[in-house]
Amino acid sequence: MNALEITQKLISYPTITPKECGIFEYIKSLFPAFKTLECGENGVKNLFLYRIFNSPKEHAEKEHAKEKHAKENVKPLHFCFAGHIDVVPPGDNWQSDPFKPIIKEGFLYGRGAQDMKGGVGAFLSASLNFNPKTPFLLSILLTSDEEGPGIFGTRLMLEKLKEKNLLPHMAIVAEPTCEKVLGDSIKIGRRGSINGKLILKGVQGHVAYPKKCQNPIDALASVLPLISGVHLDDGDEYFDPSKLVITNLHAGLGANNVTPGSVEITFNARHSLKTTKESLKEYLEKVLKDLPHTLELESSSSPFITTSHSKLTSVLKENILKTCRTTPLLNTKGGTSDARFFSAHGIEVVEFGAINDRIHAIDERVSLKELELLEKVFLGVLEDLSEK
């Protein structure tokens, strides 16, 4: 089966987070020669398929070369394709049923076509057509919870794989990374995310008696330019400057003649490797040192980067250039993704997939040409990694 046929089938399953809807049974049926691991909690399901091609022992026997470098305990390169089969709710006003894929004017329409059943369909097809001549371990990791909290999805499966000594060396997450043409962007990392809540304390009172009040909004005004929109570092070649963004501000009882007793500010900082939760706390405490306050910070994801000169990045770039005739931009833009869980285990990981102009939108679609090219890129990566 090719990428188009597989993607059509995947879209037909209404897998709104965290529903799996039986899609894993279909995927398993495509890979009868692969071993299977499954896990999940709280309604989330995860699937891991893997196969060792030409085990070192078998390969040595075939080549009549039983030297010490071809012993059975020599581990082959383990490469993993990763993704999610869950989708966000489709919403209304689609031109067609979002879970009944249709082809129109060179595009495949359906929820998840770009994010990310198109990418999954492409790497499943590439995996089916892969036939290496040397020892190679190929795996596929899929979850039904990436669009949701992600607590029991890829992160949980990787923990299980660590217990079984099955963590991959390299992985491509098939997120829709491209902006205008297929191949124009590879994510080699992601920014981290820190959420915070700041409460400035005052003394509530009657507006007619200002000497008896301490209005925390006045205090906030004096430090707001040092908090809202401030750059926490200067970034680097791949990361934009880390920035603190206020997301909510609340004070008062709603009465026109009562000053508030406190003002609450919630904020988020998307940050590079140069900024940490500790450095952000140090900065804010310095700014707020003369003001009564409480401060809470929580890191929801850590920043990471895979070097632009890594083997995986180089092989992917070469295949994109060869197949798509495009030189990809290496960047770390966008929100968080499951790639961060791979990086946390020391796995070399990048993200590459379809154009993202209609992700989470009505009439989501992917071009038939994209699916064809994606499949070729992914297969080329497999073939090159197995030969190098």
Swiss-Prot record:
Functional pathway: Amino-acid biosynthesis; L-lysine biosynthesis via DAP pathway; LL-2,6-diaminopimelate from (S)-tetrahydrodipicolinate (succinylase route): step 3/3
Reaction catalysed by this enzyme: N-succinyl-(2S,6S)-2,6-diaminopimelate + H2O = (2S,6S)-2,6-diaminopimelate + succinate
Cofactor note: Binds 2 Zn(2+) or Co(2+) ions per subunit.
Binding site for Zn(2+) 1: 84, 115, 175
GO biological process terms held by the UniProt record: diaminopimelate biosynthetic process; L-arginine biosynthetic process; lysine biosynthetic process via diaminopimelate
Disulphide-bridged cysteine pairs: none
Self-association state and partner proteins as the record states: Homodimer.
Cited PANTHER family: ACETYLORNITHINE DEACETYLASE, N-ACETYL-L-CITRULLINE DEACETYLASE
Similarity comment: family membership: Belongs to the peptidase M20A family. DapE subfamily.
Protein name (record): Succinyl-diaminopimelate desuccinylase
Source organism per UniProt: Helicobacter pylori (strain G27)
Source organism phylogeny: Bacteria, Pseudomonadati, Campylobacterota, Epsilonproteobacteria, Campylobacterales
